């Protein structure tokens, strides 16, 4: 029996990701990116090619970021990203992603990026660069908005139960309750 997995934000570690997929015996039908900054999509082409997975992004992100801005960030980081991946699936707030018995709700959490999303389900939320352990995402890139970022966090993420595990795009995991009590940006 084949088990399916979901890859979220395959940054720049295609080999490590594909090794884990192989070791776990997973098939990957879908790659979801929380936002299209290069450090979250760098491995998409290689992982997509190796797994045959479809790529899913929020509709606002697909129109803004999957092209020029990703190339700009790539060149700033010393990388090469001449052929940005094109998504097969456009996501909207409230969509449900179902993979092998797992169900995640798409929460549109713009601010760090116009089409930024978080994925919530099974007592956890993957926040990309929206919410960190005692921090929030940057809002000084083109298309970012600090006001919108804080509003997204307060209305979409802080409404989740306190014991919800938060897995940010960078840094250690935390909980919604811990961030509600101690995040200085909120």
Predicted regions and their residues:
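Short, glycine/acidic-enriched loop or turn micro-motifs at the edges of active sites
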Residues: 1, 12, 38, 61, ...
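Secondary-structure boundary motif
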Residues: 1, 23, 49, 159-162
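Conserved beta-strand hairpin/beta-sheet module of binuclear metal-dependent hydrolase folds
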Residues: 1-24, 118-127, 132-133
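Residue-level marker for buried hydrophobic side chains located in beta-strands
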Residues: 6, 32, 55, 126, ...
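Short, flexible loop segments at the rims of nucleotide/cofactor-binding pockets, characterized by
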Residues: 6-10, 31-34, 107-109, 143-146
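Active-site HxH/HxHxD metal-binding segment of metal-dependent hydrolases
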Residues: 13-96, 184-185
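Metallo-beta-lactamase
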Residues: 69-74, 96, 103-108, 113-186
């Amino acid at each position: 029996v084949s088990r399916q997995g979901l890859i979220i934000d395959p940054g720049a570690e295609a080999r490590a990701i594909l090794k884990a997929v192989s070791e776990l015996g997973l098939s990957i039908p879908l790659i979801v990116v929380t936002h299209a900054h290069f450090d979250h999509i760098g491995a998409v082409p290689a992982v997509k090619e190796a797994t045959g997975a479809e790529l899913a992004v929020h509709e606002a992100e697909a129109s803004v970021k999957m092209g020029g801005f990703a190339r700009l960030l790539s060149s700033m980081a010393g990388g090469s990203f001449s052929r940005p991946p094109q998504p097969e699936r456009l996501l909207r707030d409230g969509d449900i992603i179902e993979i092998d018995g797992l169900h995640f709700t798409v929460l549109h959490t713009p601010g760090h990026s116009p089409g930024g999303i978080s994925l919530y389900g099974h007592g956890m939320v993957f926040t990309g660069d929206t919410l960190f352990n005692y921090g929030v995402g940057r809002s000084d890139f083109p298309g970012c908005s600090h006001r919108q970022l804080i509003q997204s966090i307060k209305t979409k993420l802080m409404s989740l139960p306190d014991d919800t595990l938060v897995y940010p795009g960078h840094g250690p995991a935390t909980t919604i309750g811990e961030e509600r009590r101690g995040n200085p940006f909120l």
